[in-house]
Amino acid sequence: MELHATTIFAVQHDGKAAMAGDGQVTLGESVVMKHTAKKVRRLFHDKVIAGFAGSVADAFTLFEKFEAKLNEYNGNLERASVELAQQWRSDSVLRKLEAMLIVMDKDTLLLVSGTGEVIEPDDGILAIGSGGNYALAAGRALKRHNGGQMEAKDIARHALEIASEICVFTNDHITVEEL
């Protein structure tokens, strides 16, 4: 059985960028192994935020690879993401990794997947993991209808809270990072 980590949400709003992740790690389909995992991290001199969903061991491998690419390309988020995606897709060992990453800096928000995809959303919102669709819907509604009264970090936190009320693989122990 593998350990899985679940929901990550990221938003760009009013010149700020925020990412939130829940703390639940699940063994298989029925056992919660940890409630306080930190799946959102600051990288490259605190200028980049990255979050993962999927197999925990695979995600740590990808974090290391991504951080190495960030350092190699002097913090250029887009270049580091494309290079990681190319390596991930072409390397026979990396190709077996079961995780996804959301990475962001103040200006750019990207989804990086093992199929070689690097996707920048049109609306400045991304979510991944088992509760991703719930968080995405909640975040879009919050940004669209309350965006004038909320900061990016608040949208991120509330989107994850709503997802945790619906998805059994997402809890309400939420980590939020903001740029």
UniProtKB/Swiss-Prot annotation:
Allosterically activated by HslU binding. SUPFAM superfamilies: N-terminal nucleophile aminohydrolases (Ntn hydrolases) (SSF56235). InterPro entries: ATP-dep_Prtase_HsIV_su, Ntn_hydrolases_N, Proteasome_sua/b, Proteasome_suB-type. Its main location: cytoplasm. Its EC number is 3.4.25.2. It comes from the Bacteria. The keyword Transcription does not apply. It is found in: Cytoplasm. Keywords: Allosteric enzyme, Cytoplasm, Hydrolase, Metal-binding, Protease, Sodium, Threonine protease. It holds the Pfam family Proteasome. Na(+) binds at residues 164, 167, 170. GO terms for molecular function: metal ion binding; threonine-type endopeptidase activity. A double ring-shaped homohexamer of HslV is capped on each side by a ring-shaped HslU homohexamer. The assembly of the HslU/HslV complex is dependent on binding of ATP. This is ATP-dependent protease subunit HslV.
